[in-house]
Structure formats: structure tokens, C-alpha cells
Amino acid sequence: MSGSVNQNTDQHSQDSSSTPNNKLTKTLASLDDSTLEFAVDVLSHLPLIRRSLNYAKNLLVRLFVMYMIVQVSYYIVPFVLLVLFGYNQSTPDMKFAIQLQVLVVSRGIIDGIIGVLQFIFWFWIFVDLIRFLFGYAKNKVN
């Protein structure tokens, strides 16, 4: 009877040797030095990778917001100009002239909006890039 108890405890100790910590230790022990150096190098760059992804996300969000502003302005600017030029109160002869004026003026206004948004976008990129590079250099020194 005591023999069966010893067999159970031996089997239990073998089961506990396959815990995740021991598997990780065995896996790490089986890796060569170059693989471990590569893993350590990648792990040391995780803050930079995280900051790079955050920078790219912010860039895409800004680009999307500016794209939406331009798309909305294609509908709002001509409507506002039609109201300002008095399209509803004009005669049928004048409606074509007003439509032509609205087409030309709204295109100029929209091009101006696009130009201002491009300036803001590139300025943001420049400022963020400088902050990103100097922030990385500051973290690299410390």
C-alpha cells in the first residue's frame, strides 16, 4: 500500500515540472545567444515602437479630421453662397449667373480651406517630428 502512495507523489512531482515557468525556462535555455540578444534588443526598443505607433495614429486621426472638414465644406460653402447671393429671390435669368458665380467663388474658398489645412497639417507633422526625435534622444541619454 505504501508503494502506491509513493508512485502517486512521484507522478504529482512530474506533473508540476510541466508548469508554464518551467516550460519558459526550458525554452529560453534551448535558444542560442544570438536569438536571445535579438529578443533583448527588440524588447529594449518597445518604448520607441510604442511612441512610433502613437505618432502614426495621431497623424492618421489628424488627416481624417482634415479630410472630413474638406468634404463637408464641399456641401456647406456652395449652399451658404447661394443663400448669400439671394438665389431664391432672383429671376430665372439670374439663377444661371448666380450658379456660375457660386461655382467659381466656392471653388476658390474650398481651395483656400484646403491650403490652410495643408499648412496646419504639415506644421503639425514638423512639430511632432521634432518632439518625437528630441524626446527619443532625451530618453536615449537617460
Swiss-Prot record:
Subcellular localization: Membrane
GO cellular component, one term: membrane
Superkingdom in the source lineage: Viruses
Transmembrane regions: 63-83, 109-129
Disordered: annotated segments: 1-22
Keyword Transmembrane among record annotations: yes
Keywords: Membrane, Transmembrane, Transmembrane helix
Protein name per the record: Uncharacterized protein L817
Topology of the protein relative to the lipid bilayer: Multi-pass membrane protein
Gene source species: Acanthamoeba polyphaga mimivirus
